[in-house]
Swiss-Prot record:
Keyword Endoplasmic reticulum (UniProt): yes
Disulfide bonds: C179-C213
CDD domains noted in UniProt: lectin_EMP46_EMP47 (cd06903)
Signal peptide coordinates: 1-28
Protein name: Protein EMP47
MF terms in GO: carbohydrate derivative binding; D-mannose binding
Organism listed in the record: Saccharomyces cerevisiae (strain ATCC 204508 / S288c)
Ranges facing Lumenal side: 29-412
GO cellular component: COPII-coated ER to Golgi transport vesicle; endoplasmic reticulum membrane; endoplasmic reticulum-Golgi intermediate compartment; fungal-type vacuole membrane; Golgi membrane
Subunit annotation: Homooligomers. Interacts with EMP46 in the endoplasmic reticulum membrane. Interacts with the coatomer proteins COP1, SEC21 and SEC23.
Record family assignment: Belongs to the EMP46/EMP47 family.
Primary gene name: EMP47
Biological processes, Gene Ontology terms: endoplasmic reticulum to Golgi vesicle-mediated transport
Domain L-type lectin-like: residue ranges: 36-254
Protein location: Golgi apparatus membrane; Endoplasmic reticulum membrane
Amino acid sequence: MMMLITMKSTVLLSVFTVLATWAGLLEAHPLGDTSDASKLSSDYSLPDLINARKVPNNWQTGEQASLEEGRIVLTSKQNSKGSLWLKQGFDLKDSFTMEWTFRSVGYSGQTDGGISFWFVQDSNVPRDKQLYNGPVNYDGLQLLVDNNGPLGPTLRGQLNDGQKPVDKTKIYDQSFASCLMGYQDSSVPSTIRVTYDLEDDNLLKVQVDNKVCFQTRKVRFPSGSYRIGVTAQNGAVNNNAESFEIFKMQFFNGVIEDSLIPNVNAMGQPKLITKYIDQQTGKEKLIEKTAFDADKDKITNYELYKKLDRVEGKILANDINALETKLNDVIKVQQELLSFMTTITKQLSSKPPANNEKGTSTDDAIAEDKENFKDFLSINQKLEKVLVEQEKYREATKRHGQDGPQVDEIARKLMIWLLPLIFIMLVMAYYTFRIRQEIIKTKLL
């Protein structure tokens, strides 16, 4: 009897054990599971480093990097470098999420060193190690964390297509996005999460401790094999011993729940304060802008001159063509006037004294003079016609809203030039006839 009870108890215990095991499995991996745990890829992630005795076989360390007390120390001493690369490439299809947990201890302040996280084409690694101990010529994404830029400690995103190497001296000007990030000499590690979703209109989002650093939909990674890694160097400034340490790295085949956290508390951005002083009242006004908005307000003298040239061109575009035609007409009339005046001067100076022996009558002489100088006498009529046409043109231009202060000014100057010429012509014509009359009287006498 006791044996039967013992056997029943053993069977029941086994049944309960199996049920409990299945319940645990179902809870951890339910049917059709879409949780973050099901998306975690152990082949592309770091295992628990606390219990690890050596660097996993699917990862490769370089330079001074080493596993120490549950973390991988990339830079363990002054002027040191370190790297950690995944040996196998990741075949990108549509989306992924990767998280790096790291910290920096041992130094705080400006330094020419930094730590870079890489997601680059497989063919670009590890050809060179000139950019923060990483490739200077790569095709993919680089996330740089350093404290050598103009805005202090920042996280910056860099993109390159592998066509030309990245210039380290211009890396801050070529960043497509960035955010402030206080990371130095902190006992609390920071987590950088990179999410890319091809199906969500090429969404690329970078988060720091669940806060959005930046995001964009203007970046698209082509399909292919990519290498994942991290490199660091602590630089030579002040011979610092800044230690960059990796605690955790997880890679997910898809977008996880934490990637969808709304940006309620945005990360801090640098602020620039500009003081404006009113010259008339002397009042001061402070305007606060982000560094990126302030850069948009800057304009060089060359750009200012180009803008002024465009404005001047638009002002003159409405009337310059018609005005040029009128000016050409005026110049033509002036040339004809000078030609006639030259002819008159020559005739008056070269004509011999007349006598009455030829039997020329006074009426015939006057008629002959009028015939010789009919072109000269018609100049006044032509000038009057030009002035009338110019006045009509000005009135028509005013009606069409095309006339401006410049046309009036030019017309006024032309009148100043033409009126003295007309007066001179009339005076010369008067004295010419007087001389002619005196000559006729002399003949009669």
